[in-house]
């Protein structure tokens, strides 16, 4: 018993609940008449597990793995859906009733093609900031992002006033944002100076402003905005799971945006009159009168929202200016007007001659197939066609439009690279949408950048090259 108690105290023995324990002799085990050596007793022994309170190695590994899985599950069920929903359009905000007027907003960056050519290292971050700022305003004012096309936004709103507030706040946000560079503003001013040199009647609205005055009115990317209100053909896209808006209202909103200048907000009389009298008192507008819009039978009464008091703008970019403008177009419709080759700059004539020489042996269908990527890449309107294939005039018009657009960008890049050069002495390589060089113009070579692509480029001597037409 003493030994048992001793062992029990040392934790080396236990009775596991046994009671009435006695010590028998071997004789007692063989003969029950022989009494036990000790009387039965129940020792005060308790079971004690020496590993109690400790976690084994296997259990520890299991706890670690289980904790990691639990953390992963929290991330998967919480954080991932948050980011997914954050970047997904909220269809609850989409106007869906066919009988309710919808206010549509179109936006576009002024001179984005020229900016990409001049500042390929800055524009990716600038455009990403542009998208982030606009999307934050869409959420703030309960509007709906319909789509983005390049650097253009199409936005729908159930409330006309919310749309107007968004457009006004957009201009203020861009004005007060720290873009981290003055290069974009300098490029806009250079573009205005270039146009003033080409057109004696044109007065640059910002290029000659005092620096302090300029900084109060302008900063960074300039975005033009057009607003129109009306009934729409509303459809849900089964692929994107979002809503889109078709018909006269969307066309009118796009046309309204297209005639504006960067930093300018235009709204049709339909949008303005959709506001209540109290709402109209909260905004500052300037009546612009009737404005002719491409594809619209009658002139449309237009208002300018003075989002940034003190800003002045050039005249509206009306139909006769659209085709030769260096801006990116948000529509793909064609203008009925065209210009002869003599209207093109030297650089544009060089590009046109190169394309004509390169594609001259192609069939009309082959020329159309080759030219469409250029039109899409440089965002120029496609020419009208009869049937499924462009005729010769259509192909020539497509070449002229592409050449006019690329030529203006090259002119801008040349002027920016060397302010002392008064006539175009450099050219560039014309690139396909996939990045392959399609046509290289030949003669004196210089270094230039076109739409963010830099390299040694050459110019064709139109007077000495017998292959040009």
UniProtKB/Swiss-Prot annotation:
Residues 103-257 form the Guanylate cyclase domain. Residues 1-59 are extracellular. It is a multi-pass membrane protein. Its cofactor is Mg(2+). Its main location: membrane. It is found in: Cell membrane. Mg(2+) binds at residues 108, 151. The keyword tRNA-binding does not apply. It catalyses: ATP = 3',5'-cyclic AMP + diphosphate. It holds the Pfam family Peripla_BP_A-cyclase. One of its GO terms (molecular function) is ATP binding. GO terms for biological process: cAMP biosynthetic process; intracellular signal transduction. Residues 81-469 are cytoplasmic. Binds 1 Mg(2+) ion per subunit. InterPro entries: A/G_cyclase, Adenylyl/Guanylyl_Cyclase_3/4, Nucleotide_cyclase. Keywords: ATP-binding, cAMP biosynthesis, Cell membrane, Glycoprotein, Lyase, Magnesium, Membrane, Metal-binding, Nucleotide-binding, Receptor, Transmembrane, Transmembrane helix. Belongs to the adenylyl cyclase class-3 family. This is Receptor-type adenylate cyclase. It comes from Trypanosoma equiperdum.
